[in-house]
Amino acid sequence: MQTTQRASSFAAAEDNIAMDKAVVYTRIPHLYLWLEILNILSSRPLTGYAQHTSLPEVVIPLRVTGNRPMWAMGWLTYSLHFGGQKHFIHIKAKKFLVSRLFSVFTYTKQGALHKDQPYVQNDCYYHGHMDGDPESMVAITTCYGGFQGILQINGTVYEIKPKNLSSTFEHLVHKMDSEETELLPMRCALTEEIARQMKLQQNENPTLMQSHYEGWWTHKSFLDLALVVERERIRYHNNNTSRVLVEVFTIINIINNIYETLDVELVLLGVEMWNERNHVQVRSIEELLDEFCMWKARSLNFRIPNDIAHIFVNHEFGIYLGLAYIGSVCVPSHNCGVDRLLGGNLFYFGRIIAHEMGHNLGMEHDSSSCTCGTKICLMAPADNGIPKFSNCSYSYYWATYATAKCMRKEKKSKGILRGKLCGDGVVDDGEQCDCGSAKSCADDPCCKPSCTLKDGAACAFGLCCLYCQIMPAGTVCRQEVNECDLPEWCNGHSHKCPNDVYLLDGSPCRDGGYCYEKRCNNRDEQCKQIFGKEARSADHSCYRELNTQGDRFGNCGVIRDAYLRCHDPDILCGRVQCENVAHIPFLRDHSTVHWTHLNGVTCWGTDYHFGMTIPDIGIVKDGTDCGPEHVCINKKCVSKSIWRSQCSPKTCNMKGVCNNLHHCHCNLGWDPPHCLKSGLGGSIDSGPPNYTENYTEKKHKKSIGLVILFWILFACFSVLFIVFLFFLRSYVELPMSEEPKVPTPENKEDTNEVMNTETE
């Protein structure tokens, strides 16, 4: 292969440039058209015409439920019985496999470039593994009904797909053809000579010499991917571009599964299909790589920004499977590769493409000293069935990652990865609502699939929308969450709650702290959050000793590849140091707890190293005090005067507080903007409160309470009265002594006798 770029020798190259300028941008009239087309594919296996070595087994995937922690993290478990035993698969949805701004480029018969932005379901691709076998692989999709995809167990690959016309969720499991899944004579086209030439060519390119980044601790990285599918591969799918897309999505899901061990996430930004003719000639694989890279640099890069771009070709290259530039990721002129796709074994294709992308990421072919638990790994020169990276591949990757700036970017799930599409579940400009999929819209009482409100509906979403109607003014739509926050109320006209406002930065809060960005900042409280309720901020000697070291355990920030030592005035603004720690806390992955004995004090802290994507819990928070009238801002101890504001309790007539927009938030009984007149309180930013309604409600509740209390007392008195009557009746009915009878004429004599007797 030539070491310098040469002009294209392919026909119509000049026409391509002119044609690329005439892009026809279109939108699909009905967004669910793509879904209906793709659903047709459920009758055809995703692996195309792949051969199988045995008759299929019928299985019924059964969902397994229970109290396992992994389910709380989005993992699902299913049991499948095949191969004479029961298997449990753990799967998790792969979010953002396809960009929300995903574009498909095709060509008209006249040669005009046609752009579509179809709705693509993005939560139905799953990756995972078999229970008890961390080396296994599961890559399936549920987008088209049931499970369709690949299961790899102990080096054996199975295809799973739904059984047609089954009413009991039956699936078919096939064992893939062994001649495609075991060691083959096919190999990567990268030879030692070509590798040397590529290195020489790249070393001469100054764009490859990016900033050195010693000490980088690698974690999550993101790669924007663009793909091109040449004419013959589209013909293989009977010119059905929807089938091509399904194949592409499934392959990317498999590759993402392979690269998960490196914590690399691929996001597909776009696909270009050469459905009319190829725009470069397909001859030898070396020439194709050169010409594709040149075409990409002058054409594709302007349509689909990418970190890596590959072309899928349905063409024989002898024994060669693919070719890619080494260490070329992030370099627009060389970050490309060629992949040969013949037949329909998508797992086989996934290994090929993952191998060639490995070259883009700096990985060379494995030598005899490289290992991945077996002697043959993914980056072996000849293809094999083991999609695992070796220790050598890891080393090459780390070296490339240290200089590959495009990989060290924040995830683009927000922002440019989202296009304006009705039906994607996100309300864009010009849409009254967006209920998402057809099923979701069928269940939505307020929104139509056309992203307009249903008859009688005034709203479909928002904190001030209830049962498709706007809530009345004065309804609380956002309660305060802490002492540094302020409430908001609906205004009666909008379905949206007013913007969140909170106390002005610098407002005092508990334990001598200050409010800053809606939180009360205090080092003692920060230590409690990390190490438990008994912990507290350590002695100043801990801060002085550790934060002046300038390492990952004590520093005042990072510039490029170096930790900054804290100067003495700023030691309280570096990393928080704690004491009185009773137990080591449970922290997220990649977190480190350290302790140091210093002059009879044990100083506790956490580290935060390069490449971590989780929040840093151990850095002293901005707004924390660092001395009299001083606070920490950007790891510097600065005067509290930076919070000087025209708003103060005095400007609020001492009847309110200042919010973060420097406006008065008045107490109950005073009216904004300056709390000078009687009113309901609140601010010009919070919406109108309805304290009267709240007072009436409280009064009503109080009245109800008094009524209840009255009836309770009445019942008690009634019981006491009944008891009193019972005892009174018992007393009246007690037996009493007989009284002397009054003598009558008939018994007069007898009476006298008795009386005489008694007197005697």
Curated annotation (Swiss-Prot):
It is found in: Membrane. Residues 221-413 form the Peptidase M12B domain. The chain crosses the membrane at residues 707-727. SMART domains: ACR, DISIN. The active site is at 356. A motif (Cysteine switch) lies at residues 186-193. InterPro entries: ADAM_Cys-rich, Disintegrin_dom, Disintegrin_dom_sf, EGF-like_dom, MetalloPept_cat_dom_sf, Peptidase_M12B, Peptidase_M12B_N, Reprolysin_adamalysin. Residues 214-706 are extracellular. CDD domains: ZnMc_adamalysin_II_like. Expressed specifically in testis. Residues 738-751 have a biased composition (Basic and acidic residues). GO terms for cellular component: membrane. Its cofactor is Zn(2+). Residues 738-760 are annotated as: Disordered. Glycans are attached at residues 154, 164, 239-240, 391, 690, 694. Residues 1-50 form the signal peptide. The conserved cysteine present in the cysteine-switch motif binds the catalytic zinc ion, thus inhibiting the enzyme. The dissociation of the cysteine from the zinc ion upon the activation-peptide release activates the enzyme. This is Disintegrin and metalloproteinase domain-containing protein 25.
